[in-house]
C-alpha cells in the first residue's frame, strides 16, 4: 500500500477533527435545554472579529421582548467590501413565555418567544477600509465608535451621521482618522472618566493616546502622547475603571505594565511584571475591586494580579487547552470572569469558589472556580461581550460567521446555598 503523502495526512487529520467538532456540537445542542436559559444563534454574512453590546435598552409597548443594539464588524474575502455594523437584538422579557426546554432546531435557539425569525437584524452598515479588527463605543456617547483597522490608522465614526445603507461607491468616510501608529493591532480602550480619551496598542510596540475632542485638521488627528516601552507587539490596552490616570498594557514580551499619566516620567510604566511564560494577549481590570486585574496568554492560562503586590499572581486558571485571546469581567457580579481561547471554548469563572472542597467526580470536570463552559461554537471565538443590561447574558462571535447570544441556566450560578429563605431558623 503506497505511503500517504504529507498533504494527504494533513487532509485526513482535518477531516477527523471536523468530524469530532461536529459530534461535540451535536452533543452540545442536545444538552442546551438543561444548560441554558437562552440561546440565540445567528449566522452573519461574514465573520466578525469584534462584538460589543451598546448600553441602551428599550421595551417596546405591548411586546414580550426588549430591544438592544450591538456593534459588529466584517472580515470579508475576495475583495468584498467591509463594514462597521450595528445590529438590533430582541431579548425575551423575564415574564415572557420562554421555555428553555423547547429547542427550535430550524432556528437553533432556546428560550424562544414570539416569532422565531428576526431576533437579530443588521440595521446599519458603514463602509470600512479592510476588516474591522476591533470596535468599541465611547462610554460618554455611544454613537461614537472607534475601530482598529488593517492599516496603522484608528478610525472614529459617529454612526448617527451615517446612512443605514452604505454608499455604493464603497468609500470609507470616518469622522476622524487617528495617526501615530506604524502598523495594525487590536488594543483599544476609551476612558470612562475623560470623554474622548482613547488608548490604542499595536504591532509596532507602541501605545498611542488621543483626545478626540481636540481640534483636528482635515479630519485627522495626531496622538497626544506615544508610549514605547514594550519589547514587541502591544496586544491589548485598558484604562483603569476607578483611577482616571491609570492604564494597563500587555504584549508579546510576556509583560503586564501599569502606567500613570501623573508620573514625572510618563514614558515609563510605574509597575512592570513578567506576567506569563508566553505572549500576553489581553487584560481586564475588575469593575468593582480597584486592585484586581486579569490577564490571558498564549501559555493557555488566565492569571489574576493584585496591583498592590504585582510581582506574584494571586491565582492561575489553567483549564484552557489553547491560547487565551480575550478576558472580560461581568459588569454585574464582582467575582465572575469569562475568558475564551483558540480552542472554541468560552469559560466562565467564579472567584468566590476558588479552593472550595470538591467531590472526586466534580474535580474531574475542572477546578471548583470553573463555573461554566460554553461549547456552542465550532470554530475559534474572536471576541465576546457581557450584556450591560441583562444579567448573565453574553454575546460571542466566531470565525465561522456565527454570532451567539446566550445565558447559562440560573441553577448553575445559584447554588442551593444562595437561595434566599424566609425561615429565620435556616438563615445563616
UniProtKB/Swiss-Prot annotation:
GO CC field: chromatin silencing complex; DRM complex; nucleus
Localization (cell): Nucleus
SMART domains: WD40
Keywords, ordered alphabetically: Chaperone, Chromatin regulator, DNA damage, DNA recombination, DNA repair, DNA replication, Nucleus, Repeat, Transcription, Transcription regulation, WD repeat
GO BP annotations, alphabetical order: chromatin remodeling; DNA recombination; DNA repair; DNA replication; embryo development ending in seed dormancy; heterochromatin formation; heterochromatin organization; leaf development
Database matches in InterPro entries: G-protein_beta_WD-40_rep, Histone-bd_RBBP4-like_N, WD40/YVTN_repeat-like_dom_sf, WD40_repeat_CS, WD40_repeat_dom_sf, WD40_rpt, WD_repeat_RBAP46/RBAP48/MSI1
Pfam families documented for this protein: CAF1C_H4-bd, WD40
Sample GO molecular function, one term: histone binding
WD repeats: 127-167, 180-220, 229-269, 275-315, 319-359, 376-416
Major subcellular location class: nucleus
Quaternary structure and partners: Component of the chromatin assembly factor 1 (CAF-1) complex, composed of FSM (FAS1), FAS2 and MSI1.
Known role: Core histone-binding subunit that may target chromatin assembly factors, chromatin remodeling factors and histone deacetylases to their histone substrates in a manner that is regulated by nucleosomal DNA. Component of several complexes which regulate chromatin metabolism such as the chromatin assembly factor 1 (CAF-1) complex, which is required for chromatin assembly following DNA replication and DNA repair.
UniProt family annotation: Belongs to the WD repeat RBAP46/RBAP48/MSI1 family.
Protein's name in the database: Histone-binding protein MSI1
Organism this protein belongs to: Oryza sativa subsp. japonica
Gene that produces this protein: MSI1
